[in-house]
Design a protein with these regions (language model features):
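A short, conserved beta-strand element in the Rossmann-like catalytic core
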Residues: 14, 126-128
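Short beta-strand segments
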Residues: 9-10, 77-79, 120-122, 149-156
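Short N-terminal binding/cap micro-motifs at the start of the first secondary-structure element
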Residues: 14-18, 87, 161-162
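Short beta-strand-to-loop acidic/aromatic patch adjacent to the donor-nucleotide binding site
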Residues: 116-126
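Short glycine-enriched, charge-decorated loop/helix-capping segments at active-site entrances
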Residues: 21-27, 92-97, 167
Length: 212
């Protein structure tokens, strides 16, 4: 059994990216894709299994570009995100749906290939080494309890802003005990003069640039 599994969400259509498959676009000096960096950092942190959540029509390209290569370094499994892979009590209620479900259903699709504490990441985001170290340390030191243990690795807002325009971020709110209370999807956050600002018709809104 795996000590800690890395689950990579890679089934998204990527319609805003254009005609190519965003998750498989090379960005490194030797043709590396973003997942190469995430997997390298995860293995270095201690993760010993990788699960790719993909669409069935991406399988061939996925294996040719990254899957077959990664299998030489670590145990690899695939989960296919299908529209009808939902709890039985909901089957038949969404027969006309064509849009893929979100992250929750994608994780559910992994139920037959994940048997250990796991970390979920996006295929097209860069996280950095420290994020994987923090997650692995948490996942491999869980208390003995029947209560489900969940964590989230957050990033300080100022470290996620761009010099090239506004970005969308999930801004977190925590309670007095440091526990996550809310996540608000916030659009068009810009970095100006060391501040995080959203320009609106009725005035500028400033965010705490040191918030998670």
């Amino acid at each position: 059994m795996s000590k800690a599994t890395l689950v990579i969400m890679a089934a998204g259509i990527g319609s805003r990216f254009g005609g190519g498959i965003k998750q498989l676009a090379p960005i490194g000096p030797n043709g590396e894709i973003i997942m190469d960096y995430s997997i390298y950092d995860a293995l270095e942190a201690g993760f010993d299994k990788v699960v790719f959540v993909i669409r069935k029509d991406l399988e061939k390209d996925f294996k040719e570009i990254i899957g077959n290569r990664i299998e030489k370094e670590v145990e690899v499994a695939y989960a296919f995100q299908e529209l009808d892979d939902i709890p039985e009590k909901f089957s038949g209620k969404f027969t006309g749906r064509t849009k893929p479900w979100g992250t929750g259903q994608a994780i559910l699709c992994c139920k037959d290939v994940v048997d250990a504490p796991f970390l979920v990441i996006n295929a097209d985001d860069y996280y950095g080494k420290e994020a994987f170290k923090e997650a692995y340390a948490y996942l491999t030191n869980l208390p003995s309890t029947d209560i489900m243990q969940i964590c989230m690795v957050s990033f300080v807002l100022k470290n996620t802003l761009s010099d090239n325009g506004g970005v969308t971020r999930g801004v977190c709110k925590v309670d007095g005990h440091g526990m996550l209370a809310d996540i608000e999807e916030t659009h068009n956050i810009e970095k100006e003069d060391g501040k995080a600002v959203i320009h609106k018709e009725d005035g500028d809104v400033f965010l705490d640039i040191d918030s998670p």
